[in-house]
Design a protein with these regions (language model features):
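N-terminal Sec-pathway targeting helices
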Residues: 1-19
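Histidine-rich, glycine-flanked metal-binding segment
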Residues: 29-48, 56, 60-100
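Acidic, glycine-enriched loop/beta-strand segments at the rims
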Residues: 38-42, 56-69, 366, 384-389, ...
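Divalent-metal coordination cores built from histidine and acidic residues
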Residues: 94, 99, 116-225, 239-243, ...
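Metallo-beta-lactamase
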Residues: 101-109
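Acidic/histidine-rich helix-loop elements
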Residues: 160-176, 246-255, 324-332
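Structural recognition of alpha->loop->beta junctions
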Residues: 190, 231-253, 374-387
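Active-site neighborhoods of metal-dependent hydrolases
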Residues: 191-193, 252-377, 473-477
């Protein structure tokens, strides 16, 4: 008995030590993102400005409002006019640059708070996180309460999948009753949206849709192969993810434009449905196959170290081996990417609402930087600059009611804004590295944004990231 008590004491002592080490690790990691915290005495806490000498690209119409003034009051666009007279306000001279709505990335996977800075430095002032974990609820709370400077943050709950789709990243549902319980739980805990994933059969899928409607939660859907593709055109499902899913499911990898057209037509008739192509993440498969040293590239230094050590490495090895076993795989991947571009073109021509999403945070798809690659792909698919910019602004904001305050420069809207040196309606690349970012009216200059980049580069938070993921597994599984 004494030996048992002694063993129990040792076990509890070890557990206590491990918990203490974990808490210290997370505490130390929090210092790395201290620059995101809002100090009420710091200039970045100010969220009221009068912007002068600025050319406004409102994005509610294809135009430029030349030489305007824009009054931001407590994080809201209060007034846009030729002349505004306000006393006691800080004036920001835009020097005849261009003011656009902040960009919205509608498909991301956030792994730490350093990534929030990477999004801001690239002009992304709102994100839709599509793999919810407890840490995302804490980020969301801090954003809402104004504790940190961050993109406006929306998140789904954990990915809902069927029983046979095994993996620690999936929440496997075994019955309609369990599906309803999870939706109710996600709503109560503060998740914004529901994400359905691969492997949901009809009964469970129906249960999720029914309960989501009752709970007033929009659904974002990575199509399930257990139901017809057209099944995802349900009014409760506000966006469908990935152009590649059209290839994999209804087309069964047959890259046939005639067969594609009927699928495009069915999507276009579903006026409540937005489509998020995520061209970049699939193209990055091709990039991995073409560059054997991609994991050592300068850009990957911005990737979360846990993801770089696990998912990035795993994906690279998968496609490296596929190329080695069958060299023609490279050509097939490139051909499918080109077909994805055709899908984007056809979706646009059919009047489908396209929303910009990158799938950043997995593989080698970088947070923040990747949105400019995604937008360039849409341009190459045949969209005009205005139509491209719509995908990351007004189209995104109309997809979910909870995002309606974003996406355009209008009086009463949230002051998530970019100041860029050139007109993006003529030069799309002008959106890269904006000179100034306003997020809920708070101003970040280029020097501050570059500092956020540097803090994220080569960060040493692998253990802290692993602990947060462990928390997710304990809480959600």
């Amino acid at each position: 008995m004494k030996i048992l008590k002694r063993l129990l004491k040792i076990v509890f002592a070890l557990i206590g030590v491990l918990v203490l080490i974990g808490l210290i690790t997370l505490w130390v990691d929090s210092f790395g993102t201290k620059s995101l915290k809002i100090d009420k005495n710091d200039p970045t806490s100010n969220n009221s400005y009068l912007i002068t000498n600025v050319n406004v690209i409102p994005m509610n119409q294809d135009t430029v409002l030349a030489d305007k003034m824009v009054y931001l009051k407590e994080g809201i666009i209060e007034k846009i006019a030729d002349t505004i007279e306000i006393s006691g306000i800080q004036i920001f001279d835009a020097e005849n640059k261009y003011l656009t709505p902040g960009l919205i990335d509608m498909h991301v996977h956030v792994w730490d708070r350093y990534e929030l800075g990477l999004y801001l430095s690239n002009g992304v002032t709102a994100v839709r996180n599509l793999w919810g974990m407890p840490m995302h609820l804490r980020i969301k709370e801090d954003v809402i309460e104004g504790n940190i400077i961050s993109p406006t943050f929306f998140t789904t709950g954990p990915k809902l999948t069927g029983t046979e789709f095994i993996g620690d990243d999936n929440l496997n549902l075994s019955s309609p009753e369990e599906a309803k319980e999870k939706v109710i739980s996600f709503k109560e805990r503060g998740y914004d949206l529901i994400k359905t994933y691969y492997g949901l059969d009809k009964e469970i899928f129906d249960a999720v849709v029914v309960q989501a409607k009752i709970s007033e939660m929009d659904i974002v859907s990575h199509p399930s192969q257990k139901v017809p593709f057209s099944y995802h055109l349900n009014p409760q499902i506000k966006s469908i993810e990935h152009a590649e899913e059209i290839v994999q499911q209804p087309l069964h990898f047959d890259l046939d434009t005639i067969k594609l057209q009927s699928i495009i037509d069915s999507i276009s008739q579903s006026k409540h449905t937005s489509y998020c192509p995520t061209i970049t993440v699939f193209n990055n498969i091709y990039q991995m196959m073409m560059n054997d040293s991609i994991l050592d590239s300068e850009s990957l230094k911005y990737m979360n170290p846990l993801i770089k050590k696990t998912d990035s490495k795993k994906q690279f090895e998968r496609w490296f081996n596929a190329k080695r076993e069958d060299p023609e795989t490279v050509g097939r991947i490139k051909k499918q990417h080109d077909f994805h571009m055709t899908i984007v073109k056809k979706l646009h021509e059919a009047g489908v609402t396209i929303i910009c999403g990158t799938d950043a945070g997995i593989g080698v798809t970088l947070p923040g930087f990747s949105i400019h690659t995604e937008l360039a792909f849409y341009k190459n698919a045949g969209l005009s600059n205005y139509e491209v910019l719509k995908t990351a602004t007004v189209n995104a904001s109309k997809t979910h009611t909870l995002m309606n305050q974003l996406g355009t420069i209008e009086e009463g809207k949230t002051a998530n804004l970019l100041i860029v040196d050139r007109n993006p309606l003529t030069t799309l690349s002008a959106l890269k590295a904006p000179s100034t970012v306003f997020v809920k009216g708070r101003k970040l200059d280029r020097e501050t944004l570059e500092h956020l980049n540097e803090k994220a580069k080569n960060r040493k938070n692998l253990m802290a990231s692993a602990l947060r993921y462990l928390e997710h597994l304990i809480v959600e599984r």
